[in-house]
Amino acid sequence: MNYNKKSIEDIDVKGKKVLVRCDFNVPLNEGKITDENRLVGALPTIKYLMEKGAKIILCSHMGKPKGEPKKELSLLPVAKRLSEMLNKEVIFADDDNVVGENAKKAVEDMKDGDVVLLQNTRYRKEETKNEEVFSKELASLADVFVNDAFGTAHRAHCSTVGVTNYLKEAACGYLIQKELKFLGNAVEKPERPFVAILGGAKVSDKINVINNLLDKVDTLIIGGGMGYTFLKAQGYTIGNSLVEEDKVEYSKEMIDKAKEKGVNLLLPIDNVVADKFDKDASPVVTEDQNIGEGYMGLDIGPKTAKIYSDAIKSAKTVVWNGPMGVFEFKSFANGTIEVAKAMADSDAVTIIGGGDSAAAVNILGFGDNMTHISTGGGASLEFLEGKELPGIAALNDK
């Protein structure tokens, strides 16, 4: 995939109507935004376009309204908060059909530097099916398209891909540019040693990632629930731990592939276990890889955490996707904390692949110590799998 895409700085936007696909899919509680990270992330692109005298038309989805208007998924709270953040009124075009009379009038009345926000794009059932009718309507409002929503770049929707069939100028915003720089470099030309850490519950979610990364990394670290399927593949007992029986054979193949490729594949050598999945369960540390009958693994053990941390400390590039244990339970958060600490203390390029690992790093307060925290869980995974992301492929090459 070609990651060398035109950015907003490569196009002349003065006086032009610029449709910007943002990721404003933020959590709401009683109409109040509870996590503003995605709004903050969008500001550099919006401010640049304002300074350059563009007419800025923002669009985004929120949640899953499934093709019909749902008041609780309206982008009105986003318009209000953005107005405060930008010190400028963001006009909210509240049309149930997204591109309706309000939107058309608001866009018609725009002056250079003005900002309009359209209603939730997923109010339209055509959006997720990438149907031409809605793509055309969105494109009819603008002269130029800018995609700055990495979180949905792996989806071919009207507002990420369809509009580019009708707007010949299509570039990426600063957020996507940053994602492409860090993730692209890690996958294409990493500074070595290159260490990747994969955690989370399921091997099946990460099958292609494991396979693709074994062709690229020097060390691959496996933790979290998926570690137990690998332990079983090595012939250890895993008690009542999470296991995907149908992936044991695949795990064996990956262990063999790592040997063939000369990749250092690190798997748990001890575990923190309990007799039930409960935040108040008493943690027990196993002596080795084996987990006794009646117990389930809920975190990597201290010896494993030390080995993983040492591998991270010797790296020049580290990519991490997925926690090492049930980090929501204090007794089983230590593995994730140790990995996060090792990355925070490292001089390497450290990249967090969105989703649960990003949440863990931010909750633990290590966010500022990482080189890059990806804004897209699913998108960053597909990127690490080596897949082409349709929302990026659709943009103009440099």
UniProtKB/Swiss-Prot annotation:
Binding-site residues for ATP, renumbered to this chain: K206, G297, E328, G354, G355, D356, S357
Enzyme Commission (EC) number: 2.7.2.3
GO cellular component terms, semicolon-separated: cytosol
GO BP terms, alphabetized: gluconeogenesis; glycolytic process
GO molecular function list: ADP binding; ATP binding; phosphoglycerate kinase activity
Record's keyword terms, sorted: ATP-binding, Cytoplasm, Glycolysis, Kinase, Nucleotide-binding, Transferase
Protein name: Phosphoglycerate kinase
